[in-house]
Amino acid sequence: EEAMSLSHKIAVMSRGRLEQYGSPEEIYSRPATEFVAGFVGKPRMNLFTAEPLERGLVAVPGTGLKVDLELPELREKIRIGLRPSECHVVSASEEAAAGRVAVIEPLGAYSDVIVDIGGGELFVARESGFPEVRVGDHVTIDLRDAVRHVFDIETGLRRG
């Protein structure tokens, strides 16, 4: 956080290796690797393994989460990243829900809503103010405003 606010350029390293060098905006908006994506930003980026369904639509196995990536040629598993600040929760029926609200962390100007999406996976959405949903509510996750960050499952490198 401090480096993001004070620096013109940042070097992100892992295990003695340079992962990415760039401006705070470049590193936050276009992380070069999955490591950088998970390291920069609070709360951390939601990162999941996903597999292709049809024409750019991917699903996180064992969960109700499906994401349109607009990558029709995708045929293999990938890692997908979604920033909590770009995702929102919406009340839903049990049948239509992607998950259930597990925890709400009210932090004043915003609240972190932690959703159990099944398969042992948790999804964090950052809502402004105090959310209308409650713990135990069934919800869908609105990804309309979310930038989709796609990483190679083997190398961790950004795709596209």
For the regions a language model picked out, list residue spans one by one:
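Non-catalytic connector elements of ABC transporters
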Residues: P43-L47, L53-G160
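Short, glycine/charged-rich "phosphate-handling" switch motifs in NTP-dependent
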Residues: K9, Y21, R30
